Structures are given as structure tokens and as C-alpha cells.
């Protein structure tokens, strides 16, 4: 597996422009096969999104690395992840900052991710079963918010839970999706289009 990880990192992520050594180290250290069904473990270090049940997926390693890099994290960044999913993106974030807050609307995924993170000795994460569209007001404001499912429009609650100069990285759209980075400056928000992407939809309101 170490050879597969090294190959992924050295030949693919770096070729794709990922430069943050801390992010590359986090991905290198984490056993991605633990976050996916055992039957798919042979694909763990390929650059593919993979199903994790409940109609959800684990993002491809490049997208995990790219979205994380766009957050411009420091060790003391207050981070919110919307969409815990398998917990893989959560674990990458947890290697980079002192504490991660993560919301998941599907209870079984939230529970499984919480259990797995503990098995991997990752304890600097708070998880919540809730509606990601609303953010996590009691933990706000955030230096960085990462959304791992595509919203039809940008949730206002997430914008106003950002700190000044904070970044929101979010896929937007339905059939055609774009990855955006939104930066707050006072009461204004500035948006950059990063690239085209494909994510499962961010479902508002409904908990499962």
C-alpha cells in the first residue's frame, strides 16, 4: 500500500499542482482503504470517487487535496466541514488543524465516521448529526468552511458564519457544477471559480 500511496502522491497529486507538503503528508499517512467498503479496497489509492453507502461517495484524492489547499489553513484555524461522509476528508483536516467541526445529515454515516476516527486515534474532531445548510452557529465564526456536496445555491447561513477573510470552499450547481472559493471581507463576499467538478447533492432540511 505504501508504494501505491507514494505513486499517487508523487506521480499524480504533484503533477496536478498540489504543493502543500502538510496536505500531502496527511494523505500519505491516512489509510484510505479504511474509509471505503472492503470490496473496493483495491481501488483505495486510485484517483476515483467511490461509493460509501446511503447514496454518498468518498471524493477522489485530488479533490480532497485541492479543496483543502484552497482553505489556506493554519494550525489554529477554526474549521467547519459540511458532509462528514466516510470521515476521510475530516481526517485530512484533523491532521492539519487543532480541531475540526463536522456535520452529517445521515446518522449512520456520522456514527461510522466517528467510530473510525477514534480507531485511528484521531480525537480532535467534533461531529454533529444535523442540517449542513444551517452550518453550526454555536461553533462559529469559522476561518474555513468546506462543503463536500453540491448545493443549488450558496447557503446564506454558511456565508455569515465565516470570519472576516475566511474562506468557504463549495461545489455549486446541479447537472453542471463548479467548485467555488468564497472569501469574506467585512460584509462583502468575493467568489472565485476554481474548476468544474461532480459531487452528490447537498440536501437541505432532511435528516436521515
Curated annotation (Swiss-Prot):
A GO cellular component annotation in the UniProt record: cytoplasm
Cystine pairings recorded for this chain: none
Enzyme Commission number(s) of this protein: 2.1.1.77
Residue ranges of the TM segments: none
Keywords: Cytoplasm, Methyltransferase, S-adenosyl-L-methionine, Transferase
UniProt keyword Cytoplasm, yes or no: yes
Entry superkingdom: Bacteria
GO MF assignments: protein-L-isoaspartate (D-aspartate) O-methyltransferase activity
Coiled-coil residue windows: none
Pfam families documented for this protein: PCMT (PF01135)
Primary location group: cytoplasm
Keyword Cell cycle: no
Active site: 59
Catalytic activity as recorded in UniProt: [protein]-L-isoaspartate + S-adenosyl-L-methionine = [protein]-L-isoaspartate alpha-methyl ester + S-adenosyl-L-homocysteine
Family that this chain belongs to: Belongs to the methyltransferase superfamily. L-isoaspartyl/D-aspartyl protein methyltransferase family.
Stored HAMAP family: PIMT
Name of the featured protein: Protein-L-isoaspartate O-methyltransferase
Gene name of the record: pcm
Amino acid at each position: 500500500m505504501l508504494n501505491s500511496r507514494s505513486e499517487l502522491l508523487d506521480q499524480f497529486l504533484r503533477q496536478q499542482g498540489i504543493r502543500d507538503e502538510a496536505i500531502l503528508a496527511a494523505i500519505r499517512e491516512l489509510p484510505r482503504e479504511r474509509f471505503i467498503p472492503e470490496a473496493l479496497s483495491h481501488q483505495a489509492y486510485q484517483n476515483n470517487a467511490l461509493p460509501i453507502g446511503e447514496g454518498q461517495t468518498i471524493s477522489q484524492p485530488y479533490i480532497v487535496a485541492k479543496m483543502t489547499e484552497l482553505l489556506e489553513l493554519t494550525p489554529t484555524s477554526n474549521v467547519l466541514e459540511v458532509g462528514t461522509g466516510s470521515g476521510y476528508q475530516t481526517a485530512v483536516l484533523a491532521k492539519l488543524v487543532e480541531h475540526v467541526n463536522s456535520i452529517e445529515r445521515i446518522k449512520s454515516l456520522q456514527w461510522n465516521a466517528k467510530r473510525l476516527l477514534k480507531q485511528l486515534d484521531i480525537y480532535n474532531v467534533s461531529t454533529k448529526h444535523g442540517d449542513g445548510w444551517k452550518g453550526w452557529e454555536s461553533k462559529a465564526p469559522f476561518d474555513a468552511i468546506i462543503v463536500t456536496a453540491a448545493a443549488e445555491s450558496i447557503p446564506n447561513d454558511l456565508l455569515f458564519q465565516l470570519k472576516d477573510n475566511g474562506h468557504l470552499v463549495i461545489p455549486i450547481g446541479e447537472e453542471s457544477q463548479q467548485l467555488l472559493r468564497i472569501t469574506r471581507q467585512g460584509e462583502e463576499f468575493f467568489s472565485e471559480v476554481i474548476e468544474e467538478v461532480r459531487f452528490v447533492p447537498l440536501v437541505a432540511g432532511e435528516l436521515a
